[in-house]
Amino acid sequence: MIDELMVQQQVKSVWQHMVGVMCLNLTYRKQVKKLLPKLFKRYPNATAYIRGRYKTQEKMLRPLGMSTVRAKRIRLMSMDFLSWNRKDARALYGIGKYGNDSYRIFYKNE
C-alpha cells in the first residue's frame, strides 16, 4: 500500500502531483521514486520548470525512457497549469482520466 501512494508521499503541490502522474505512465514506480526528489529539487514548480533548460530536463528524465517526449509533455502541461482553473485536470496537456481521477481523490476529496 505504501508503494502505491509513493507519488503522493513525494509531492508538495498539485503541479508536482501531475508531474508524478505523467512520469508513472509506462514506467516502473521504483524508477520514478528515485527520480522525483531530484527533479523537484531543481524544479519545485511549474514556473521553474518552464524557465529551465529543456536539454537539462530531458537528461534528468532519461532514466525513465522516452525523455524527449516526457520533457516536452511536462513543459506543455506546466504552461497549461499556470492558467488552469483547477476544475478538471484533463484540461492540462497530457493528463487523462487516470490523472484526473487521482487529482479528484487527493485534492478535491471526491
Give the location of each predicted region.
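Catalytic Zn2+-binding segment of zinc metalloproteases
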Residues: 101-110
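Cytochrome P450 C-terminal beta-domain/meander region
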Residues: 87-93
